[in-house]
């Protein structure tokens, strides 16, 4: 069979090369057309800039030439362009590359001095193909009488493009489902862009439409007044953003918790007077309890000692958690190393598996070809067996005829000898008697006998020619037997190659099973790590709740101290603390808060690092597992849309299920390979037995023909010719059938290559879209991290400013 060269696992034939050349020529023609279009577009932009220097060239749309002309060149409709003193072909030419040269002319020589770098003034937009303009038939605009304008006039109605209509429809749909200020701003931008394209003298209209955005100031008026009032009365400045509600809720939550700690009852808001009364009463109780519990020049109170105990306990707990996090990070590192090792082993096994799969595909093709040849040989053997049986029957008949002919020949020989004797006697008698009549009679008899002898000699010559033809047929049979022996040797060579491939396959199967076992062990370790992480997360949440309560309690005391230090503070009873003691306690609490915040920040960083390492490990496992297995797991078990799933958001159970599905798939493929190998060995053994049987049959026929010389001498020529004709017909049929089958196989192979190439192109397109989505998500994550860092920095500065004491 004909073997085509391969490129990337695909057969490369003349048809593929022809298609590639046609594609290259088409792309080259399109690129030249685009270059000419881009050159003309740059010349138009230069004309626009010269005629109207105030034009914003950065907002030009390359595929909207009519809108460009209507927008920037409508004022010059009645102006004589020839009166311009600018040389367009000379001015600003340094901003553009030279115009494309036709194919028949040689390219211009490059200039000797290096050209200066081109400023990115006109080259900051992507190049698009020419906009496909469609010229509708001219229609007469409807005339309508407009009141208040001064009579009847014709109105020029504009028509939106398909892109503008689709964009407005999408905005309308979004505004119907979820009305937000961002959608309103998008609508205003789209409307301004449409007005700029379709309306002449649109400056006033654009200004009017842009003023719609000032409605936001009316919407935000109440929030602005609220924030200004809060700042005037509390010296705390808020901003109108997504954290405004959270900040206010934090203050309210703090008040309710302090109210519960002091009053031992839940706070319920009814009226403003009640809230004022509760606030004054709560402040009085806290002030009284603090002033009574504080002694002059005394060391820290029982609450301070308890706070130290709590801090030490929290420090110990943070140390334990940090050690545990270090252990988890070490386990993650070891797991990552094992995953990398397994990944390399998996890549090697995958490469070997692909090679074996290609060899198996070649063996399958050879197998199908051998099966086809075997079927043809079986048919030929059947026909030969029938022919041999017919020849045996004919040989039996010919043997009987030969025996009869032998008897006739013996009789003829005896008669000839007797006639010769009679002739000799008659000649003697003639010579003696000279009887003329008797001599004539004898001459007639002699002539008749000579004719009979000639007939017998002709029959002997025919028998000799038949025997020579039978010898040729025997020689041909021997050549066929030799071909069968060569085919048997090639089959034995293929058997050896298959045995070697089977040995390699068994070795790879053992390595693959070992890899699967290691993956299973890694999966178990990952499940244990996930369980440990969940428990650690729960403990972290509990510790965070405890820390929040402690911080709230300490912050309440700190706020009380800050109120005491204010100049407008009027104590109810005589204070028992001096200024030095207050400063001492304030510094002590500030140091404690700073240490606690630093420890909490370290713990948060460690937790974030462990979470990021776990997400990286999940991403690596998901990248190893094929995409179709992940999609099937998500659809069957979690009912989740695949395009909305990120590898970092997958649970550990989903990742484990995907790895298990991958292992099961490879086990099924291994079983299928073993089954196919067994079937192939069985069919190969049957083929060998059939070839051996055919060989023995041909050898027996050859021995029979060589052993019987009478068979070689006395075959009928007519039947042998019929047999020869049938053999030639069968050979021609076999050749024609082989040619047609080869053509069919080539067409099937070409169709398969085309389908596989189309599938490969589809998968490449999907991969490109996935890479685009990945880049977009990565950009969003980077922007989110940047905004979070800015917010954390703002929060840290606000916290530091609030911690500083008010020193007068």
Swiss-Prot record:
State the superkingdom. Answer: Viruses
Entry keyword set: Host cytoplasm, Host nucleus
Q: Where are the transmembrane segments?
A: none
Renumbered to this chain, the Pro residues biased-composition regions fall at 132-141
Short name of any one Pfam family annotated for the protein = Desmo_N
Matching entries from InterPro entries are given as: Desmo_N (IPR009615)
Where does it live in the cell?
Answer: Host nucleus; Host cytoplasm
Any one GO CC term of this protein is:
host cell nucleus
Subunit: Interacts with the putative E3 ligase IE0 and with viral ubiquitin/vUbi.
What is this protein's name?
Protein Ac66
């Amino acid at each position: 069979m004909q073997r085509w060269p391969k490129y990337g696992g695909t057969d490369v034939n003349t048809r593929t090369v022809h298609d590639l050349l046609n594609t290259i020529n088409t792309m080259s023609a399109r690129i030249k057309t685009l270059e000419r279009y881009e050159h003309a577009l740059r010349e138009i932009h230069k004309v626009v800039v010269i005629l109207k220097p105030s034009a914003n060239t950065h907002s030009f749309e390359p595929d909207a030439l009519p809108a460009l002309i209507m927008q920037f060149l409508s004022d010059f409709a009645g102006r004589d362009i020839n009166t311009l003193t600018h040389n367009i072909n000379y001015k600003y030419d340094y901003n553009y590359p030279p115009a494309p040269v036709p194919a028949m002319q040689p390219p211009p020589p490059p200039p000797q001095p290096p050209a200066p770098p081109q400023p990115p003034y006109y080259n900051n937009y992507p190049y698009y193909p020419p906009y496909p303009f469609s010229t509708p038939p001219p229609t007469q605009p409807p005339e309508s009488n407009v009141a208040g304008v001064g009579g009847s006039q014709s109105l020029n109605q504009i028509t939106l493009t398909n892109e503008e209509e689709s964009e407005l429809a999408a905005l309308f749909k979004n505004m119907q489902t979820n009305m937000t200020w961002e959608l309103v701003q998008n609508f205003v931008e789209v409307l301004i862009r449409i007005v700029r394209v379709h309306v002449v003298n649109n400056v006033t209209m654009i200004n009017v439409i842009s003023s719609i955005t000032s409605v936001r100031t009316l919407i935000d008026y109440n929030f602005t007044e609220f924030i200004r009032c809060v700042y005037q009365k509390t010296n705390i400045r808020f901003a109108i953003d997504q954290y405004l509600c959270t900040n206010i809720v934090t203050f309210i939550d703090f008040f309710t918790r302090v109210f519960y700690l002091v009053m031992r009852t839940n706070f319920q808001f009814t009226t403003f007077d009640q809230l004022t009364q509760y606030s004054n009463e709560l402040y009085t109780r806290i002030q009284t309890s603090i002033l009574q519990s504080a002694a002059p020049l005394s060391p820290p109170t029982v609450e301070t000692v308890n706070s130290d105990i709590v801090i030490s306990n929290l420090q110990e707990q943070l140390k334990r958690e940090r050690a545990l996090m270090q252990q988890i990070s070490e386990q993650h590192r070891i797991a990552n190393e094992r995953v990398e090792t397994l990944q390399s082993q998996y890549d090697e096994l995958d490469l070997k598996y692909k090679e074996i799969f290609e060899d198996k595909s070649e063996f399958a093709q050879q197998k199908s070809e051998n099966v086809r040849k075997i079927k043809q040989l079986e048919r030929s053997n059947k026909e030969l067996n029938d022919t041999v049986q017919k020849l045996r029957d004919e040989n039996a008949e010919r043997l009987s005829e030969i025996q009869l002919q032998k008897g006739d020949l013996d009789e003829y020989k005896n008669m000839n000898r007797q006639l010769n004797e009679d002739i000799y006697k008659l000649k003697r008698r003639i010579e003696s008697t000279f009887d003329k009549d008797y001599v004539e009679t004898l001459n007639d008899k002699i002539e008749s006998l000579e004719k009979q002898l000639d007939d017998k000699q002709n029959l002997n010559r025919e028998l000799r020619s038949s025997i020579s033809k039978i010898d040729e047929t025997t020689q041909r049979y021997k050549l066929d037997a030799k071909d069968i022996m060569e085919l048997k040797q090639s089959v034995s060579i293929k058997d050896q190659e298959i045995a070697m491939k089977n040995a390699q396959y068994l070795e790879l199967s053992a390595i693959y099973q070992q890899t699967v076992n290691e993956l299973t062990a890694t999966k178990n370790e990952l499940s244990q790590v996930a369980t440990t992480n969940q428990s650690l997360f729960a403990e972290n949440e509990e510790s965070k709740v405890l820390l929040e309560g402690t911080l709230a309690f300490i912050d309440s005391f700190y706020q009380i101290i800050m109120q005491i230090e204010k100049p407008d503070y009027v104590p109810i009873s005589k204070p028992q603390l001096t200024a030095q003691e207050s400063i001492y306690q304030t510094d002590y609490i500030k140091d404690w808060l700073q240490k606690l915040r630093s420890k909490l920040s370290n713990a948060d960083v460690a937790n974030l690092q462990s979470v990021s390492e776990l997400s990286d490990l999940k991403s690596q496992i998901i990248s190893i597992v094929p995409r179709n297995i992940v999609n099937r797991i998500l659809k069957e078990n979690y009912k989740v849309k695949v395009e909305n799933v990120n590898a970092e958001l997958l649970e550990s159970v989903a990742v484990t299920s995907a790895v298990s599905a991958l292992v099961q798939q490879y086990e099924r493929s291994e079983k299928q390979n073993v089954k196919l190998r067994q079937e192939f060995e069985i069919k190969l053994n049957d083929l060998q037995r059939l070839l051996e049987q055919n060989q023995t049959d041909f050898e027996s026929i050859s021995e029979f023909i060589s052993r019987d010389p009478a068979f070689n001498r006395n075959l009928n020529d007519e039947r042998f010719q019929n047999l020869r004709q049938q053999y030639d017909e069968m050979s021609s049929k076999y050749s024609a059938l082989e040619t047609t089958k080869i053509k069919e196989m080539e067409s099937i192979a070409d169709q398969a290559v085309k389908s596989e190439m189309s599938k490969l192109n589809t998968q490449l397109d999907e991969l490109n879209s996935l890479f685009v989505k990945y880049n977009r998500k990565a950009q969003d994550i980077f922007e989110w991290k940047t905004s979070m860092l800015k917010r954390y920095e703002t929060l840290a500065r606000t916290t530091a400013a609030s911690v500083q004491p008010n020193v007068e």
